[in-house]
Amino acid sequence: MVNDFGDKRGERMSFALEHLGSNLWRGKFSSFDEKICQHAFSARLGGASVKPYQGLNMALHVGDEADIVWQNRQRFFQALELKAENLVTPQQVHGANIQKVTLADVGRGAKDYADAIADTDALITNEPGLPLMLCFADCVPVIFLDPEKRAVGIAHAGWKGTVAKIARETVWKMQDEFGSEPADILAGIGPSIGPCCFAVGEEVAEKFRETFPKFTDKLITEQEGQLYVNLWEANRLQLLEAGISAENIEMADTCTDCQHQWFYSYRADGGQTGRMAAIIALNQY
């Protein structure tokens, strides 16, 4: 069973929720070739966590029991036919640090948060069989695939990371490390808080005005005296700036606040909740 979310941009471009069995669901983009890589955005259903993390909480740092989180990770990775013990994940800090992952990093953060890559909000690799994973509850996940150089990446873009242009910087890091051509890279902007729900104060709005001066009208709206920011479009614009072509950018158009029955939402769930995972891994040959 496949459920479509958001808008289809032609038959090639769509985002869907796919049932993996045992009430486990993953969101995926149609343009990411499964012959080259596996990718997934975990829904909140089908896990062992209890309230306030109820469901498939994939994060070790939110207060959930570590053994339950590990059980959730194993369950979801097994459904994806990936090895949970090989996953690499960072300690996310809403920064702009990007780390190249090698075989020396295998398993970092898989079972122990203290062992995760420190102070990092984006990962890239060209190593097959090495799943990259970041955790989210409203912030924007951006995934990357270079099918020519066989490299992948993933970035965590909250409002601070978006203003720091971490998505753009990840593209350029792939260019530096792997010789990727931005025109070859596919990018996907996953489920996250939408422009309908990301209410901000004047201080945050001003950061976006300063960072995106030509696009203020696109990114900031006001409704009944409340300012809202469009994180999806802000990240799409910086992917274009990095050299990715518009037709190679997919957007889930799925708001985690509106769809919090499917995805964890920090805002909708009152601040204490679990985290979904965004995962990407090159296939082994």
Labelled PLM ranges:
Residues 2-285:
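Active-site microenvironment for binding and transforming phosphate-containing groups
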